[in-house]
Amino acid sequence: MAYSFTERKRIRKSFGNRESVLTVPYLLQMQKDAYIAFLQADRAPQKRMVEGLQAAFQNAFPIVSHNGFVEMKFIEYNLAKPAFDVRECQTRGLTFASAVRAKVQLIIYDRESSTSQSKVVKEVKEQEVYMGEVPLMTDKGSFVINGTERVIVSQLHRSPGVFFEHDKGKTHSSGKLLFSARIIPYRGSWLDFEFDPKDILYFRVDRRRKMPVTILLKAIGLNHESILANFFVFDNFRLMDSGAQMEFVAERMRGEVARFDLTDKAGKVVVAKDKRITVRHTRELEQSGTTSISVPEDFLIGRVVAKNIIDTDTGEIIAKANDELTELLLKKLRTAGIQNLQVLYTNELDQGAYISQTLRADETADEFAARVAIYRMMRPGEPPTEDAVQALFQRLFYNPDTYDLSRVGRMKFNARVGRDESTGPMVMTNEDILAVVKILVDLRNGNGEVDDIDHLGNRRVRCVGELAENQYRTGLARIEKAVKERLGQAEQEPLMPHDLINSKPISAALKEFFGASQLSQFMDQTNPLAEITHKRRVSALGPGGLTRERAGFEVRDVHVTHYGRVCPIETPEGPNIGLINSLALYARLNEYGFIETPYRRVADSKVTMEIDYLSAIEEGKYVIAQANAALDNEGRLTGDLVSAREKGESILVSAERVQYMDVSPAQIVSVAASLVPFLEHDDANRALMGANMSRQAVPVLRPEKPLVGTGIERVAAVDSGTVVTATRGGVVDYVDATRIVVRVNDAEALAGEIGVDIYNLIKYQRSNQNTNIHQRPIVKMGDKLAKGDVVADGASTDLGEIAIGQNMLIGFMPWNGYNFEDSILISERVVAEDRYTSIHIEELVVMARDTKLGSEEITRDIPNLSEQQLNRLDESGIIYVGAEVQPGDTLVGKVTPKGETTLTPEEKLLRAIFGEKASDVKDTSLRVSQGSSGTVIDVQVFTREGITRDKRAQQIIDDELKRYRLDLNDQLRIVEADAFDRIEKLLIGKIANGGPKKLAKGTKLDKAYLTDVEKYHWFDIRPADDEVASQLESIKNSMEQTRHSFDLSFEEKRKKLTQGDELPSGVLKMVKVYLAVKRRLQPGDKMAGRHGNKGVVSKIVPVEDMPHMADGTPCDIVLNPLGVPSRMNVGQVLEVHLGWAAKGLGQRIGDMLQAESKVAELRQFMDTLYNKSGRTEDLASLSDEQVVEMAQNLTTGVPFATPVFDGASEADIMTMLQLAYPDAVAKAKGLTPTRTQAQLYDGRTGDAFERTTTVGYMHFLKLHHLVDDKMHARSTGPYSLVTQQPLGGKAQFGGQRFGEMEVWALEAYGAAYVLQEMLTVKSDDVVGRTKVYESIVKGEHAITAGMPESFNVLVKEIRSLGIDMELERS
């Protein structure tokens, strides 16, 4: 196998027993594909699919005027190139977006010449119209909105279609199941059907008042007879003089109790009265040739007439359909000579009379009356004119403008009602309504099953593209209304399309969605894993989704269809549990938005390499084996029974029945969960915490790869976009800390393209969470790269692998109570080595505005500040980069004009003596806030157009241009070197007709001559061969063209930088100062492993006091062993053992390198290590130099991969431990024979501890809950306006709440003075606290408590209730 540039530097030993048949797909595919489909920017306008922007435009256009003589048609749209790139937008606080320009035609028809059938075109005006700006997605799947990176989270919502359910017996006290159906369109009115406890079927539109369903059936054109014919089968009777003959239908008789003696043709009694009719009885009757049965008169009484019965002589209706038969009615029928009679066949069991009963409750007579009833329900109080009634009914379900079932809805609807085709009209049809009512009645009759709304076949994902399209449609709909009103004017006035279209509604809709929607979220950038997880999140919340308060347990619970689609582990703790989920590792979306997961096809128990993606609906049809099913050498399933799943149930089946098999054991979990080694040994709750806390790990100064990983680390790092990967293969030409220049391979450089790739690295950039984004090159000059190779590491990555923590030597033992209740004891060495030191960057902004009293000014000339306080500011009043600042230091000097105040004579005198300036401005400089300190790492100055730039702003622009020129020079250098190489090959050996340095005609060109001539003069050589001469000329033209294009791009960049910045209104100048703060580990910081084992640092202990091994190796961290058994996260113990083996193996390799062993010995040891168990590695493909380089990288520990659910077994761990620690080493370290525990010694006394201790290496993380951010102190500060009590919280510089229980504690101690102080002067006694302050200033400590303000508030509250209460002072 071929290893990438970084993989071969450090191969991760994998214990996976199953070769992956499918590589993990690109993890941001869902987001990126959805937005590409929305924009279709790369497709030619005429080849665009009807989706996204194209669909939105086609839906809104053409717009026709009210009179029909003016029409506006949409032709195509184009996206302009964005004015600024992503980094520029972030710096300037702009939105990374592209302008949409739509080409529209305004067609005016001739009124005189046009007829109703055909219109004659009078005039056509075509124009490109600006249609707002659409934000563009960055390469990393995020959006830059107003300078900040945001993510649009995908929404999991109920799919359009029809759903049948029941209330589970909760509505009625008897526990009767009340069935209901709901037709949900993508856009339009919801239609509900529901049974009530009396078995009458009702319908509702948009959850309004319920009405009998037969009203709706009449409104769609059915009458009583057709309604009954659709829902019932009929019994046929022939009336006799007394009684009647009933047509014998065996199925209908079976199971009934005979109400009279049943006789056959011969008159023999087959079933006696009151006996149940069985299958034997009906068979006897059939065999005797019985076709009809005599029934008594009372058998007909109460039966329901199926059709209208008309007297043929008079034309009078004797009985209407749905009338009940009575003695009187039977008499009438006989008198009229009616012999044949059809009645409804009903029974209690599976043929209920529900529709018949509903029809009886319905008072409407015909179709129009039914529609009027619906109109009155929808528009109460409005007069129902015929036109209005018909228009409303059409608009409810039959108008494509107001009702859209969507492709998904139609597919789901047809599938549910049992139709074969998946396409059809996007509006409702009469057949649809009838089909739904039939199925609902069938369900009530006991046939069929209700739907499970939590099944992923009934929930679909709305991605960013679809959500943005809906917003764009909203904007276009608003435009449509406005344009329709104004189109009439276009006939009289010479208006162009841009006069009619105002793009503001579109811009407003998009701005509102991307800036403020619940699904548009501030991107979590704590570390690369947090970034990637945020983009793969699916939320059930948001517009059109659920709300936290109303979501029940069922929606939140893990469903069988989540398998391979949604992670059952990763979800937040708290009120959002189960509502926000993560996409599983291999999951993708199908064309309808349903989540699919891949499976390998199995044919005749042989597992093939064919892979099919199945949605939750399709999966229910198959038997699917697990990924760890045993296979023989030919890939056949072995064993009599195979563990498999069918319809969500786990079953054991024979190998022949299996149709599919999982592609990977890790396919059920998400990215974050798949990064937890030994996940299968952790309790689910702790695994959830582990996956969630991995996202909160702060990037540390020197990232370190996990010794025990899962093999997904590289995929996650590369797909997150944190690392820099080579876009094309080539050779590294130049490297420094800020840029990498790669000379591209000839094969990959397209004709006419510049064969140079320059990667500018991000240095000390602030993330959304104030962590540090920083890239470091990992290549050197001359390295050969292939496309996709990692060339630079980012934050929290190490050699292209995700590295969110540090490998620490852990000991599980109590230590003087310092690790009680999950506290963590840590060695001073960890702090000294900066293992957990992180850099945090704060952005501080100051704006100079235009005020009523004059303009604010950014200056060094600030009143009442000493020179010492100003010594770090430059002449522009801005601090220099590199300054170390403390709380209160001035960063940017700013003065604001003050209002004129009347001055006393003394002040006037002082002003006259000391000058005017100091008094009419006040100091509003930007200073370092309390609790902050650090180093200034960057300053950015933005100036509004028309305002003169200061020196600092000009210097920043010059530096930026210098950097850009450097890039262009590098590109030009490589392009020219490449061109001159080609020229040299072209000219050597050719005959010349003359050239520089008096080259004689007919001279053969050689290398010596060319070396002697200046390269730029090679173009002056005149080759004798015309072909060579033309090639030389074309190379020259190409070089000149390249140089010209570089000059143009430099000019464009200069223009961008020198033009004025877009600033908020009223702002003249804005300065951003970036402070970098180093945060070392300290007590109070939160730390965690990857298994949900979290804790707070309790003490940092000197190295010499830490428990140590026999050879003097001290532990880095001591954890409490009691934290393991009750939490059931045993994975951490296995990780510690395997980490211990990894470290030992690294030390053995290090010893071999130190002893300068032969490469053959190294290869042999590595072969034993990599190829004796687990997945084998192709070490033979590496050269000796590469083996040595890899060995040097392994000295700190051999990285292991233990894939989830397919990881290292106990035997594997033991093998590695034995290999890592030969007997001599184990003895020196004081290890037990199994190498899993060691004898530790107390660092303070040197005594051995009572028993051996589990020690080993664990990947431990520092989380983004730092004590520095949480802790603060206050003496005086802001107070609440009404109660006059101090505010709460660090952000408000608030105080500590002394609550009810704390008051009880003081009361219990009898600390009366302290209590009085707490309730008065330290809280809300305004006068008292002022006096205390004064007395402290004077050096006295007397406290005079007064009246708390809260008492006055209470008095006011009581007075508001009308009770006057006064306080009498005695």
From Swiss-Prot:
Signal peptide (residue range): none
A GO molecular-function annotation: ribonucleoside binding
Gene3D superfamilies: 2.40.50.100, 2.40.50.150, 3.90.1100.10, DNA-directed RNA polymerase, beta subunit, external 1 domain, DNA-directed RNA polymerase, subunit 2, domain 6, RNA polymerase alpha subunit dimerisation domain, RNA polymerase Rpb2, domain 2
Entry keywords, A to Z: DNA-directed RNA polymerase, Nucleotidyltransferase, Transcription, Transferase
EC number of this enzyme: 2.7.7.6
Catalytic activity annotation: RNA(n) + a ribonucleoside 5'-triphosphate = RNA(n+1) + diphosphate
Enzyme class at the top of the EC tree: transferase
SUPFAM superfamilies, A to Z: beta and beta-prime subunits of DNA dependent RNA-polymerase
GO biological process: DNA-templated transcription
GO cellular component term, pick one: DNA-directed RNA polymerase complex
Subunit organization: The RNAP catalytic core consists of 2 alpha, 1 beta, 1 beta' and 1 omega subunit. When a sigma factor is associated with the core the holoenzyme is formed, which can initiate transcription.
Annotated function: DNA-dependent RNA polymerase catalyzes the transcription of DNA into RNA using the four ribonucleoside triphosphates as substrates.
Family: Belongs to the RNA polymerase beta chain family.
Name of the protein: DNA-directed RNA polymerase subunit beta
Species: Polaromonas naphthalenivorans (strain CJ2)
